[in-house]
Amino acid sequence: MTAKEQLKEISVRTHELVHVQYNTLNRSLIPALEKAGMHLVAAHENLTEAQSAFVDRYFEDNVYPVLTPMAMDSSRPFPLIRNKTLNIGALISKKEKSDKLNKKDKAGELLFATVQVPSVLPRVVQIPSKKDGDTTVILLEEIIERNIDKLFLSYDVVCAHPYRIMR
């Protein structure tokens, strides 16, 4: 097999494994957790007012102080992203009326930004539940995604998604 053929086969097999992984999560693990009274929520779901306030306060008090957001452009080299770290990648564009930061950035021009999900904090965060006796949790990367606009004040965040580099 050529290198190109090997990469294609690896990609096909990897996609199959990820499909199995998500089927197991969505068809077995999440229903079993919910049956036991544990709920995994996403930041974009309809959180209650108490849950939203808790998540935003948790971000401000615990997460924000340990984050190092980095935006890439022609004047800054691509940062070293450590192996096996979880990161949030975002597409950002400079706000129309912003004169802060890098003057070379044109309003509307898309830039790539990244922030490493801190390993010093727990990945799963318990938040207030809707129902007494239940446990509700949210992933740390969901909390960061929900508040990522607070990291890039002079920019509009177009989208943000978690990624992990494996070498």
Regions found by a protein language model. Give the residues of each.
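N-terminal non-catalytic structural scaffold regions of very large proteins
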Residues: 1-167
